[in-house]
UniProtKB/Swiss-Prot annotation:
Biological role stated in the UniProt entry: Hemocyanins are copper-containing oxygen carriers occurring freely dissolved in the hemolymph of many mollusks and arthropods.
Protein's recorded name: Hemocyanin subunit 5
Signal peptide: none
Keyword Secreted: yes
Localization terms from the record: Secreted, Extracellular space
Length: 27
């Protein structure tokens, strides 16, 4: 449903932000 799609999009956004944060932590 729409809720599931929204949750999936939010999870992707969170994962992307975590990737950026980890990249910065390595420097």
């Amino acid at each position: 449903g729409a809720g599931e799609a929204l949750n999936a999009k939010r999870q992707q956004d969170v994962n992307h932000l975590l990737d950026l944060i980890y990249d910065h932590l390595h420097y």
